[in-house]
């Protein structure tokens, strides 16, 4: 799922979790490994909690519950107050710290690989038309 639009200024600090607030994707949780401009969504970033990756996994695990929070027929909405009211068992602080210590490198690697994929796709999109039009040879 791609953002509907981009902004040249971020209002969050990576890593960032967004939960879509309205529309067909209301309740969809996404993790960004870059600063983003969060709009029409609920979000948590590294300034909100040091346990962003734990919260992200928790939200993904509670996807069915998030989907059930949608209100409204024509334009579904998921409100922050409803997300905050989800029943959740929070592990002790030491367990959260351990989870973050061991999980962070994996999530950071995922972020690096996503950025590489993005750059490779851009290269492909620039080079393929030139290759097809015989502007370059290999």
Where are these regions (language model features)?
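Amphipathic alpha-helical coiled-coil/heptad-repeat segments
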Residues: 49-50, 61-76, 81-138
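A short beta-sheet element
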Residues: 1-63, 67-84
């Amino acid at each position: 799922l791609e953002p509907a639009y981009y902004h040249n200024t971020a209002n969050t600090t990576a890593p960032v979790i967004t939960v879509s607030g309205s529309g067909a994707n209301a309740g969809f949780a996404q993790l960004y490994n870059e600063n983003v401009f969060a709009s029409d969504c609920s979000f948590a970033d590294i300034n909100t909690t040091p346990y962003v990756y734990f919260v992200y996994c928790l939200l993904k695990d509670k996807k069915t519950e998030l989907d059930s929070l949608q209100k409204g027929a024509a334009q579904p909405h998921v409100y922050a107050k409803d997300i905050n009211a989800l029943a959740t068992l929070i592990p002790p602080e030491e367990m959260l710290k351990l989870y973050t210590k061991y999980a962070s490198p994996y999530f950071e690697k995922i972020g690096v690989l996503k950025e590489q994929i993005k750059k490779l796709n851009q290269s492909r999109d620039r080079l393929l038309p030139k290759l097809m039009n015989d502007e370059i040879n290999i």
